[in-house]
Amino acid sequence: MMGGPMAGHLLRHKFRVFGHDLDPARSREFARRGGTVCPDTAAVARQAKIVIVMVGYDHEVVQVCAGPAGLIENMARGSTLVICSTMKFETIRRLERAALRKGLYLIDAPVCRAEEGAIAGNLLMLGSGDRRAFERLRPVLRTFCTDIFHLGKVGAGQVAKICNNILLWISVVANCETFG
């Protein structure tokens, strides 16, 4: 739900974007907007020096990134893997170790402001990972984020996102209590 709008912003800023989605309708829409649809994640990995992952759940990130057909195994040495999904701290650290073994940069970069923020191009990014690799990404990230923070080592982004979510849900509960 968020990956499509994020890819759309990249396309509008004239980036060449390769993508893979299990939903044929989303793939058709991506192609209609100028994206190149790949048959699988391995094909995306072989085409791009920067790969952005935006899937819904922790296990989906692992499915896309790990294993023989995953991004980590198929990306070229020196490439950057950017994970924008919200996931477990332990999982992002495990993926970082796998990426480092393959000579990749892994940037932990969960985003806030939901689908509306992705559509508007005003996401908040709570990034972490190699500082130089992160800074090289800024022109890409600015296409769909208005607020971009680097918070330290891989995992710090996920911790900050969980803190953000806790504060959000505290506010929701407080409003429900207040207004009944």
Language-model segment annotations:
Residues M1-V53, S79:
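NAD(P)+-binding Rossmann beta1-loop-alpha1 motif at the extreme N-terminus of oxidoreductases
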Residues V173-A174:
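Glycine/proline-rich active-site loop of Rossmann-fold NAD(P)-dependent oxidoreductases
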Residues T41-L106:
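Rossmann-fold NAD(P) dinucleotide-binding segment
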Residues T86-W169:
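Rossmann-fold dinucleotide-binding core
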Residues D23, A43, D58, C112, ...:
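Residue-level "edge-of-site" marker
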Residues A7-G8, A31, Q63-A66, R93-E96, ...:
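Short amphipathic alpha-helical segments
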